[in-house]
């Protein structure tokens, strides 16, 4: 974007909030890597990366966070024009699997989820309380439960992502970073479902695609390259699933069920997220064109990114508190030469 505005300024407002949010998720994933051992077995080529509802039982609400600065913003109406009558709160489950019990106790001790809740409360005004929980679900999953008004992140998903990314990570730190990014992407995706429901936001078209767009946009708005790497990890997580399906030998009936699902196919999600990352900064990510992003799609990606960013900011603007008031700087992609939106040849 031309001019004095900084398109990399944090969606969650002050950079201190962004750093704390990213650190929180990094610590969560680091804890998971200490307790979950996985095998390496995938042939997916990601060389370009180098540049079900369940019962909510036995849950208790935590006490208030001691982070007074963030909590102060969380408790204020701020610049939001819609009333702020609710809060994101934290609930802890009682997992049965010993390795999940250890994680759960670590989360409680370090108050990691409370920090996330307070930072979101400093950003968005909501009319009712919403719970955030990590829990044992019986399968890899993350979901918004409209009945219990809760965002649910499953320990099994963290374990699956650790296993999947171990097959492509260069070392333990790279594994940590990739799982951190993909889990953050999944959380913001479910937060998007929550906001559409709780705020009664209009969603024309497929809601699953809309919240993928929100997650990508929020991550790309982070300072520096950290958010871009997280968004790339989100894309790669779907690329890995796509690779698994391609090699699974599923029957026609099983594939038909995938086509009929409310989500886009894993491969489509992979390419969509890559497109929006490229559209955000074509010059930086020109290497993605044809490796693997098709050129015919790439020429339209800057316009796609601008539209999705503008749409989400328009929907959320009345609800953005002091912690989210700077988000309007992110509506345009970075400067780049990609021809026009009706087709053109990328400059290579």
Residue ranges of each PLM-predicted region?
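Bacterial N-terminal signal peptides that target proteins for export
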Residues: 4-25
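C-terminal motif of bacterial Sec signal peptides marking the signal peptidase cleavage site
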Residues: 34-37
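A metal-dependent hydrolase signature that marks the N-terminal structural subdomain at the beginning
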Residues: 40-152, 157-167, 316-344
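Pan-zinc metallopeptidase signature
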Residues: 75, 81, 86-89, 253-348
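Acidic helix-start/capping segments at beta-turn-to-alpha-helix junctions
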Residues: 128-144, 212-213, 228-245
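Short alpha-helix carrying the canonical HExxH Zn2+-binding catalytic motif
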Residues: 176-196
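An active-site-proximal "capping" alpha-helix that borders the catalytic cofactor pocket
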Residues: 204-223
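Active-site/pore-lining binding-face segments in mid-to-C-terminal subdomains
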Residues: 220-278
